[in-house]
Amino acid sequence: MQVLPPSSTGGPSRLFIMRPVATTLLMVAILLAGIIGYRALPVSALPEVDYPTIQVVTLYPGASPDVMTSAVTAPLERQFGQMSGLKQMSSQSSGGASVITLQFQLTLPLDVAEQEVQAAINAATNLLPSDLPNPPVYSKVNPADPPIMTLAVTSTAMPMTQVEDMVETRVAQKISQISGVGLVTLSGGQRPAVRVKLNAQAIAALGLTSETVRTAITGANVNSAKGSLDGPSRAVTLSANDQMQSAEEYRQLIIAYQNSAPIRLGDVATVEQGAENSWLGAWANKEQAIVMNVQRQPGANIISTADSIRQMLPQLTESLPKSVKVTVLSDRTTNIRASVDDTQFELMMAIALVVMIIYLFLRNIPATIIPGVAVPLSLIGTFAVMVFLDFSINNLTLMALTIATGFVVDDAIVVIENISRYIEKGEKPLAAALKGAGEIGFTIISLTFSLIAVLIPLLFMGDIVGRLFREFAITLAVAILISAVVSLTLTPMMCARMLSQESLRKQNRFSRASEKMFDRIIAAYGRGLAKVLNHPWLTLSVALSTLLLSVLLWVFIPKGFFPVQDNGIIQGTLQAPQSSSFTNMAQRQRQVADVILQDPAVQSLTSFVGVDGTNPSLNSARLQINLKPLDERDDRVQKVIARLQTAVDKVPGVDLFLQPTQDLTIDTQVSRTQYQFTLQATSLDALSTWVPQLVEKLQQLPQLSDVSSDWQDKGLVAYVNVDRDSASRLGISMADVDNALYNAFGQRLISTIYTQANQYRVVLEHNTENTPGLAALDTIRLTSSDGGVVPLSSIAKIEQRFAPLSINHLDQFPVTTISFNVPDNYSLGDAVQAIMDTEKTLNLPVDITTQFQGSTLAFQSALGSTVWLIVAAVVAMYIVLGILYESFIHPITILSTLPTAGVGALLALMIAGSELDVIAIIGIILLIGIVKKNAIMMIDFALAAEREQGMSPRDAIYQACLLRFRPILMTTLAALLGALPLMLSTGVGAELRRPLGIGMVGGLIVSQVLTLFTTPVIYLLFDRLALWTKSRFARHEEEA
C-alpha cells in the first residue's frame, strides 16, 4: 500500500475512503431508512400549528340577544375565564344562540383543555335558565377553520325532515366517530318535530290560554321510570302508554272540558309533522338540501381524516333510500394534494437542474454521478429523521428540501472540485482523495455549521409563526447535516474509485468549448479583480452603498403577513337590511345564488340562512363557493372574487363579502373579510357612539376595501311595556307574561318524543298567518287570579324600538369587529398604518381599546420580531465563525457579503410585485447562510496560502479568488437553480412558494456579482487593520 504523507491523511474522511464496502452499506442504510420514512410520513398542507380551540354552543329558541348574553353567555364566560392556559375568549350572543370560542395557549394539550371546559360547564349549570332545552355543547373545533369536506344530501321523493333524520342518525354520527373529526354540522334545520300552531281566536273564544295548552301537552307526554313488581316467583316491569309519537295522537289529545264536552288539541290548533325550526334553510346550488359540513379537530391531519371519510361514505350511503342523493361538493384535500404534488415536481425539477449545472461545470460523467448520488441521498435520508420528529410532508417541508437541493450539492461540489484538482496535477486518485478531502474538511464543517447557525433563530420564533417554520428549519438543517456527512464519507470514497486522470482529461467538443469559455471568464475575472484591488476605497464605497440601499428598500417595500392562496374555495357572507325576515332573506339568497352560478369559474355553491351556531342573525347568510380546478378556469381566485362582487352589486338590498379560504387559519371567528380590527369597551353605548364614526372614516381610505363592522343596533324590537300595578291587581306576574309570549312566538320546545334511535321535539307557537307582524300581539291572552282571561293589551303597551341583533364579547367585555380587505395596489402594512393613523385622528376615549385580530395581529407580531430575527441570525453566524476561525476579524469579512443578498432579494420582490411577507423573510434569512459560502471558500484558501506558502495577503486572496472561482460559481448557480422552480411555479399553492424563490434568486444573482469583488477588498482592509492594531499594541508594550 502506498505510504501517504501526514498532510494527505484525509482527516475524518480517511476511514471511509479506505473502507468502501462499509461506506456503501452505511449509505444504503440511510437510503432505506429514508424510503421507509417517506412512506410513513403523513401529508398535509402546512405543519400542524393550530391553537387548541374549543367552541361552546348553547341554543335557547326565542331568546333575544340581550337575554342570551345575560342569562347564558355571561355565566358561562365567568366560569371559562377562570381556566388556566386560556389565551383568548370570544363570544357571540344572537337571537336564540350563544357561541363561545375558547382559544388556548399552544403549549396546552387539547385533551386537557377539553377537561377544563367540561368542568366549567358543569360549574355554570345551576346559573343557566331552568327551561334551557339542551345544556351547552362543546366541540373541539375552530369555527373559523373552513370545513375539510362539504356534502349535500337531497331527495326528490322525501321531505327534508325525513332526509335530515336519516342523515343525522345514519351518516353524521358515524362520521363524527372518525379520528380527527371535530364537528359535523347539519345546515338546513329540517330536524323532524311535531308542530302545534295554536289558533289564538279559537282558544280565546273557549276561555283558554296558550299556557293551558302547554301544561296539558307536557302532562300528557312523559317518559319516566315506573318501577317494577317483585313477586314470589316472577318480577314484572311496569310500563304505560305515556308517550305520544305522532301528530295524529297529539291532535286527539284532550286539553280541557267545557260543558262536559272534551276540547281536543285539534279543535284549537293545527298539529302537523314539520321541522323543529322553521327559520332555517340550506341550499346546494339551487336545490334545497341538508348540507353537512365536516370540520377537523385542531391538530388533526386533514388528509388522513378526509381519506377516512371517503372510505366510509359508500357504506353509509348504501343504508339510505335510493331517492336520497349524497354529493361531495367540496373536499379541501383535493387542492392540498395538488399543491403537494406540484411542490414535489418542483423538487424533482430542482434536482435535475442542479445535476445539469454540475455536468456543465465538471464536463465529466463520473464526476457528475458523484454529486448526483449525494443530492438525493441527503434528501431521502432526511425523511427518516422527519418521521422520528413527527413531521409531515407538507408545502413547507417540501420547500425546505427544494431549497436544500442547492445547499446539499455545494458540499459535494467543493470536495469533488478539490480532489479533481489534485488528480489533474498528477496525483493518484486515492492519494488525491485523501489529500483533497483532508484539505477541504474544515471548510465543509465551517460551511455546514455556519449555515445551520442561520436557522437557529427560526426555532425561537414565538407564537404560531415560530411553530409554523419549526419543521421548515429543522428539515433544512437535517438535510444540510446529512449532506455534510455524505460529502465527507461517500463523496471522497467515490472520487477515489471513479475519478482518474484519463476520465478527467477525456474531452469532447462540448467539453473543450465550455473549458475555453470558463478559462476566458476566469481570465476576465482576474483582470477585473486586479483593478478592483488597486482601487479598494471605491469598492468599499460600493459595499457601503449596498448596505444603505438594503436599509432603504427594507423601509419602503410593501409588507404583508402570509401570501393569499388560491385553494379553490371562497367563503361568503351575504348581508341584508337589519329588519329582514327569514322569508325575505331566503328570497334574496336565491337571487344571489342565481348570479353566482352563472360565473364560468364556479363549480358549485352551498348557502345557508337562519340563526344557529354558525350564522348570527336572520339578515345574514353564509355561502361557500367552490371553484373549478385551477387548470379548468382562466382566472385566479382574487379576480373571480372581484367579478362576483361586481355581478352581485346589481342585486338590490344586499351586500356580499367574499374571501378565499386559506390553509393557515389564525382567526377564531368567521369574518366577512380577511382582516379584522376590534374596538372593545366596558359598555355598548360607547361602541354605538364611536364605531360608526370610525367605520365611516375607514371606508374613505384607499388602502382599505370592503370595510364593514358587525355592529348592528337597528334590529326591530317590539317592547312590551307592562303596567306592573295593573298586572299585580289581576294576579298576573311577569313570568306569566313571558310564558305567554314565549308560547306564542318562541317556537317553544315544550315536550320530547323518545324513540329507539333519536329524540324529537314538540314545538308550540301561535298560527300567525292571518295576523302578521305586531298585530299578532293583540291575540295574546293571560289568566288572572280568579280564572278569567285577560288580553295582553289591557295591561301592556307595545313600543317599537331598536336593539342590537347580536352582542359580541372579547374576554368578557363588549367588542365590535371591523372587517376589511386590502386592494391589489396596497399591502397589509399600508392598511395597518392607515388604520392606526385614522384612529389617532379620532381621539377615542380611554375606555375604548383597539386591537388587530387574527392574521393582522400575527402580522404585527411577526413584523416586530423580523429585524431581531435577522440580527439574531447574523450574531449566531458570527459566533460560530469566530469559534471556527479563532478570530474576531475574519467572521466580519465573511458577514460583509450579507447586504448584497438583501439588496438583491428586496429588489427582486419589488420588481415582481411581491410583498415582503413571512415567506420572503425566511428566504432572506436563508440567503444569509448561502452568500457567506463564497467568502468562506475564498478566505479559507487565502489563509492556507499565507500560512503554508508564505504568500502576502494580497497575492493569497487574489489566488484564492481565481482558484475558487469555479466552485463558487458552481455552488451559487446550484442554489439559484434549486430556487428557480419555486420562483416560476404556477400550480396550486404557487402563491405560497413563489416569494421564497423570488427572494433567493434575486439575492443570489446580485450577491454573486458583487461579493466576488467586495470580499477580497474587505479581506485586505481588515488584514491591514489587524496589522495596525497589533503594531499599536506592540508600541504601547515597548513604551511601558
Curated annotation (Swiss-Prot):
SUPFAM superfamilies documented for this protein: Multidrug efflux transporter AcrB pore domain, PN1, PN2, PC1 and PC2 subdomains, Multidrug efflux transporter AcrB TolC docking domain, DN and DC subdomains, Multidrug efflux transporter AcrB transmembrane domain
Keyword Membrane tagged: yes
Predominant location: membrane
Residue ranges of the TM segments: 16-36, 347-367, 369-389, 396-416, 440-460, 472-492, 537-557, 863-883, 888-908, 911-931, 968-988, 998-1018
A Gene Ontology cellular-component term: plasma membrane
Homology family: Belongs to the resistance-nodulation-cell division (RND) (TC 2.A.6) family. MdtB subfamily.
Protein name (record): Multidrug resistance protein MdtB
Organism: Escherichia coli O7:K1 (strain IAI39 / ExPEC)
Name of the gene encoding the protein in the UniProt record: mdtB
